[in-house]
């Protein structure tokens, strides 16, 4: 399979095929994933920086990130966003946005343009090892999953603060694995676990589904994007946190499946390997 790049040129057809055994296969892997290496957070990692200088630097970097992202999404990918008006229903509260995982670079910038406020995105600690962009991910809103018991506790406290006190948008990719240009929706490998943030904080969720379509530019194979926002879906006060997790996960999955029906162009082909007898 072709290598993913920030500025993706047209890819030869023979390089746009991926044979897989399981939906949890990784078409794109970092060196750490190739080595099956567990990556820990840096010692003394702060999920919410205490220093005002660091917070100011983060705001400025996010602004620059958003400006570049606006150009990248609108001009390079010709992306159109549908349904942003639905976010108005969540004014006065934080919310969680669940997205399909189909492009390692669009998936960084897209939610920032889709949301109506600053985003904080749950990421794997492995992403902190990515060349160049890895070290700055926390400055532009990356929230690495905790590895140790203390890190997990600190992460949960930070997420609750962002959602409840600061009323921000938490972004999650429940499919977990990036499948470039994939036009379907995978079952969520972790089930309803990532829906605990909305359930326990009683905040709504939205979905953001990226779809692919033929370019309007003559001779260009690389697709353009149309992005659909759906929701809100709310926790039910009559249900327990566990029941709400299951409810919200089902609603998010069904929403993303429905929105994925807008896809009209299969740029990459995914073929399941036949089982060996």
PLM-predicted stretches and their roles:
Residues 85, 101-103, 110, 176-177, ...:
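Short, flexible active-site-adjacent loop segments at beta-strand->alpha-helix junctions, enriched
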Residues 2-39, 156-277:
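Non-catalytic C-terminal accessory region of glycerolipid acyltransferases
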Residues 89-149:
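Catalytic core of membrane glycerolipid acyltransferases/transacylases, capturing the structured
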Residues 149-155:
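Glycine-rich anion/phosphate-binding loops
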Residues 81, 121, 142-144, 205, ...:
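Conserved beta-strand scaffold positions in the cores of enzyme catalytic domains, especially
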Residues 103, 151, 186-190:
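Short, glycine/acidic-rich beta->alpha junctions
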Residues 69, 111-112, 134, 160, ...:
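Short amphipathic alpha-helical segments and helix-helix/interface helices
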Residues 2-96, 106-110, 275-277:
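Membrane-anchoring hydrophobic helices of lipid-metabolizing enzymes
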């Amino acid at each position: 399979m072709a290598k993913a790049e920030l500025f993706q040129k047209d890819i030869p057809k023979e390089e746009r095929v991926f044979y897989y055994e399981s939906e949890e296969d990784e078409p794109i892997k970092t060196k750490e994933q190739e080595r099956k290496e567990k990556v820990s957070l840096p010692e003394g990692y702060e999920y919410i920086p205490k220093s005002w200088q660091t917070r100011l630097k983060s705001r400025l970097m996010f602004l620059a990130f958003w400006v570049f992202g606006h150009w990248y999404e609108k001009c390079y990918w010709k992306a159109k966003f549908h349904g942003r008006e639905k976010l108005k229903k969540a004014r006065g509260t934080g919310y969680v946005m669940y997205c399909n995982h189909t492009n390692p670079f669009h998936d960084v910038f897209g939610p920032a343009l889709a949301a109506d406020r600053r985003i904080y995105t749950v990421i794997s600690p492995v992403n902190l090892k990515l060349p160049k962009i890895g070290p700055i991910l926390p400055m532009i809103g990356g929230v690495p999953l905790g590895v140790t018991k203390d890190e997990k506790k600190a992460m949960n406290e930070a997420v609750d603060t962002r959602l409840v006190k600061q009323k921000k948008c938490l972004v999650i990719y429940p499919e977990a694995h990036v499948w470039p240009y994939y036009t379907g929706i995978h079952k969520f490998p972790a089930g309803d676990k990532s829906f605990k943030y909305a359930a326990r904080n009683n905040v709504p969720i939205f979905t953001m589904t990226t779809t692919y379509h033929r370019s309007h530019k003559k001779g260009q194979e690389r697709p353009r994007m149309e992005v659909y926002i759906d929701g809100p879906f709310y926790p039910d006060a009559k249900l327990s946190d566990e029941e709400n997790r299951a409810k919200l996960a089902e609603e998010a999955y069904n929403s993303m499946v429905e929105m994925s029906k807008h896809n009209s162009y299969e740029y990459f082909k995914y073929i399941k390997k036949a089982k060996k007898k």
